[in-house]
Amino acid sequence: MEGRYIVYKTNKVVRRVNFDEILYVESDGRQIKLETECGTLSYYEKISAIAPSFDDSFCRAMSYCYINLSKVRLMSGGIVNFGCGKTLVLGRDSFLRVKREYYNYLRRSIQS
């Protein structure tokens, strides 16, 4: 993931956000919200424009949300817990799908 990034651009700021800084990405109407350990960054973009650049550590949780599996520490009871203490609540079907993807991601990481 090193060297891969998303360009965050607003009227006042242009910033590079590395993939390893991102916990999850979600779409809220016309805005993209990048949730990082330091806070939330919002800007206007379509999630379909940035999703193809994600590597295999990102998992599609819902049509409007992608989770960085490398930042997940625990998944339990419909809640995704990240290493920094932040959480994300998912519906039952989405949680089960992401939990399965997370398990497969961990197995691939061990084998590498």
Label every model-predicted segment.
Residues M1-S112:
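Basic, polyanion-interacting recognition surfaces, primarily
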